[in-house]
């Protein structure tokens, strides 16, 4: 639970927090606590993963591209980043959406100009309405909600209870639906229930739009992330902790995903990744809601100090992974007691 974790962290019961802390800057600017993040200014952390809203493609009407795209382009992502993430994420104006995280290495792996017309930054209410109107998905009975083949479009958007940033993001998704005539309500099951449902196909009723994670940084990225988001090998399976929880299938995407590991030519690899981004932004089986760090790395220096931070002089730099993962463990050798 984020709130309980934040309370313990503020009290000095936790030295390094990997939880999302809303308005983290208030801990030092307003509360005067000896707290800091890896980066001193927004977004305070290094973006590495792409928390994603998945469409249940087995749900009524969500097999229609116009419905999926309308919802995705109508969402106010700036509000998600400002409110749900309290600016601890780059915006989609700063880092246009693709399948890549914001790091320079991944951003260099696709042709930005080639997909520019497919990228969207959100809050395009009029564009979303036109998409639906052009597809004949309109409100014919005057109740305020659009219908597809005579049935109102009603969806439940969901995230785990207590995951406050995800819940806030899902509320923004639901609000977008209302603005374009699609009835989206929200529900927040406990994680113990949530994780058993979303990992087993077919999805239960009430999981039409749902949040899950994507891969962060690593030696197999972005290939592994893309595979987990798009590969049909995971579609419509049970006990699925890999990805593609919405049941998306595209043979062209599968072919590219299978071919990439054997590619050695940089130009060929870039072309393949660019084509995958095109497919993803054209079909919209899911959509990224924010950029998120591999780990939130916020430290309380009440007891220990000299934690890793940007420009700390370590060579190679110790990454902000909470002193627990890979080279981040090296940071343990640098911390010292505030009062020895």
Language-model regions: role of each:
Residues 59-67, 138:
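Short helix-loop capping/hinge motifs at secondary-structure junctions, enriched
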Residues 6-7, 26-28, 53, 63-64, ...:
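Extracytoplasmic/secreted cell-surface and envelope-processing proteins
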Residues 72-112, 165-175, 199-340:
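Detector for C-terminal structural segments
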Residues 1-59, 70, 78, 82-85:
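Extracellular/periplasmic solute-recognition and catalytic clefts
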């Amino acid at each position: 639970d984020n709130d309980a974790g934040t309370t313990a962290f503020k009290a000095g019961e936790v030295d390094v927090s990997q939880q999302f802390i809303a308005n983290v800057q208030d801990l030092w600017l307003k509360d005067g606590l000896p707290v800091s993040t890896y980066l001193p200014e927004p977004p305070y952390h290094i973006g590495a993963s792409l928390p994603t809203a998945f469409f249940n493609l087995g749900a009524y009407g969500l097999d229609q591209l116009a419905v999926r795209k309308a919802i995705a382009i109508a969402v106010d992502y700036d509000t998600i980043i400002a409110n749900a993430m309290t600016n601890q994420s780059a915006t989609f104006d700063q880092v246009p959406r693709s399948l890549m995280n914001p790091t320079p290495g991944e951003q260099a792996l696709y042709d930005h100009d080639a997909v520019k017309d497919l990228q969207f930054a959100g809050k395009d209410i009029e564009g979303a309405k036109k998409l639906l109107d052009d597809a004949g998905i309109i409100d014919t009975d005057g109740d305020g909600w659009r219908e597809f083949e005579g049935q109102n479009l009603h969806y439940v958007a969901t995230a785990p209870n207590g995951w406050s940033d995800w819940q806030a993001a899902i509320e923004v998704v639901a609000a977008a639906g209302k603005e374009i005539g699609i009835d989206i309500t929200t529900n927040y099951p406990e994680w113990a229930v949530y994780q058993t449902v979303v990992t087993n196909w077919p999805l239960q009723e009430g999981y039409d739009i749902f949040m899950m994670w994507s891969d962060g940084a690593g030696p197999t990225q972005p290939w592994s992330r893309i595979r987990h988001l798009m590969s049909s090998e995971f579609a419509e399976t049970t006990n699925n902790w890999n990805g593609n929880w919405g049941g998306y299938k595209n043979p062209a995407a599968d072919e590219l995903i299978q071919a990439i590991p054997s590619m050695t030519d940089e130009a060929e690899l870039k072309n393949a990744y660019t084509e995958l981004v095109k497919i993803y932004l054209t079909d919209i089986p899911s959509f990224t809601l924010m950029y998120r760090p591999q780990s939130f790395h916020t430290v309380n220096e009440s007891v220990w100090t000299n934690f890793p931070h940007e420009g700390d002089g370590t060579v190679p730099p110790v990454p902000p992974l909470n002193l627990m993962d890979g080279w981040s463990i090296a940071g343990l050798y640098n911390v010292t007691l505030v009062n020895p």
